[in-house]
Amino acid sequence: MIKRLYFFGGKTDMYDKERKAIVDFGKRLITEHLTSGTSGNISIFDPEKKLMIISPSGIPYFDTKESDIVVVGLDGKTVEGDRKPSSEWALHAAMYEAKPEARAVVHTHSMYCTVLACLREPIRAVHYVVADAGAPEVPCAPYRTFGTIELAEAAKDAIGKSDALLLANHGMLAVGKDLASAFGLARGMEFCAEVQYRAMCAGKPFVLPDDEMERVIEKFKGYGQVKNG
């Protein structure tokens, strides 16, 4: 059970790199149309100290400074920072508990992912890029009030093998080995959600079978350039 605790402290030089990354990617959430206003949130996880470096609550992304980024424990207790952390800190904590390899979480209210979430439809394998989430489809968690432990627990129960998740009548989230990976997955799933929605408007989309998706998932593991040494 995730508990809600707060303690506010000042900023040190700890996690300067992570703070900068969160500020930079927060701006990209807006410029790449993955969210609007102050909705959505971003975090990076330190697995050794079990700490989350997370965006603050209610500050526009282009107004957010590195000093606004908050460091909290998985219990929501603030370790460093003067700002209130994102209202969805428990959602992020639940993802790090569900996905031990995850080092970043991006939560958005991107248009087409949110449309499917309002239909309570998963992102199906209408386009093979869904396999980037590591599963044949991206599930949709049941609706729970935003910023609650109940939402966090529902998301944790629903995500399964996927690295992305729709939140009914709310939005989506993506996890990754680093912030760039989580952000890229969120962007990719928005593409897949748009393709699916547009196909649904035109007719009945053909969904790729699970065996083909498993093949694509395996091929994705070797996709891209191989690092030497």
Where are these regions (language model features)?
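N-terminal amphipathic/basic-hydrophobic helices that include classical n-h-c signal peptides
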Residues: 1-13
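Glycine-rich flexible loops
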Residues: 10-229
